[in-house]
Amino acid sequence: LSYFPLGQNGFVDVRDVSRATIELMDSKISGERYIIVGENLSYKSVFEDIAISLNKPKPSKKATKSLLELAWRLEAIRCFVTNKKQSLTKETARTSNQKNIYDNQKIINALKYDFKTIKEAINNTSSFLLKLK
């Protein structure tokens, strides 16, 4: 990946989702809704951590709004011609520059929960993928 979007989003390790779901089902809590998010991070930092973990160069170019608007249109044309599924859609291009922040305090308080870091999740997944090569 050479490019990174300018946005931010909430990320969570799938193991945390599974564990929190099981803990909630096993508890006496009912009728509540929870946001299960480990960390709010910029795409730049997540993409950098992924690159480092996979021994690849870190992304260095900003995927600006105008660049992403052009990219999703070109991708749509390419996929129309090749009859393939789009990897970058209008929606993903536009949301990738939004700054979304999620609050996980409610689930932390309810379960006394401690989330894994996203760096840990990335390293766990990367080590698995690198072993497959």
Question: Where are the regions a protein language model picked out?
Answer:
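A conserved pocket-lining segment of Rossmann-fold NAD(P)-dependent short-chain dehydrogenase/reductase
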Residues: 1-12, 20
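Conserved short-loop catalytic and cofactor-binding motifs
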Residues: 5-9, 34, 95, 109
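Short coil/turn segments at secondary-structure boundaries
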Residues: 6-8, 85-90
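Short aromatic/basic micro-patch
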Residues: 11, 40, 101
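Residue-level signal for the nucleotide or nucleotide-sugar donor/cofactor binding architecture
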Residues: 12-15, 116
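Mid/C-terminal beta-alpha module of Rossmann-like enzyme folds, strongest
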Residues: 20-86, 109, 118, 122-133
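Active-site loop of classical SDR/Rossmann-like NAD(P)-dependent oxidoreductases
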Residues: 43, 88-103
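A short, basic/aromatic helix-end/turn motif that makes direct DNA contacts
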Residues: 112-113
